[in-house]
Amino acid sequence: MRNRAKTALVGTLVAATAALGPLGGTAHAGDSSLYAPSDLVLTIAHGEDAASVAPERAVTLTCEPQARGTHPSPQEACVLLGDAGGDVDAIAPPAEPQLCTYQYDPVVVTCXGVWQGRFVDQERTFGNECVMRAETGAVFDF
């Protein structure tokens, strides 16, 4: 009985290794890269928090090894995020100040994915879209 269990276990491991073998090549190819991955999904929704609303707009943003994705300004967004260390709360506002109304129409943004090899899942709420753009520049301008 013990031999059958060992044989079954070995057979399962061999089958799993064979099935996952092609994926191993992909992982090794990523290891030889000079850059840690930075692939993000950015969303915008009207509401106080992301858990209670559905995203109205979403884009992808890849920053390494080159800026690309469905984001309309990937290079500019990657520079701003890079300067902030990938932290949405630390994005420096544009040098040119923008005037916004005090109308309260909350907008919540999310940034989820991988930034320089580490998982990120961030959420931030702004009083309205004007304030969001004034404080995040090109990052959430889509």
From Swiss-Prot:
Signal peptide annotation: 1-29
Family designation: Belongs to the protease inhibitor I16 (SSI) family.
Pfam families attached to this UniProt entry: SSI (PF00720)
Intracellular or extracellular location(s): Secreted
Keyword Signal belongs to the record: yes
Disulfide cross-links: 63-78, 100-130
UniProt main location, coarse: secreted
Keyword Mitochondrion: no
Subunit structure: Homodimer.
UniProt-recorded name of the protein: Subtilase-type protease inhibitor
SUPFAM superfamilies: Subtilisin inhibitor
Function: Strong inhibitor of bacterial serine proteases such as subtilisin.
Residues with site note (Reactive bond): 67-68
UniProt keyword list: Disulfide bond, Protease inhibitor, Secreted, Serine protease inhibitor, Signal
HAMAP family in UniProt: SSI (MF_00778)
Molecular function terms from GO: serine-type endopeptidase inhibitor activity
A GO CC term assigned to this protein in UniProt: extracellular region
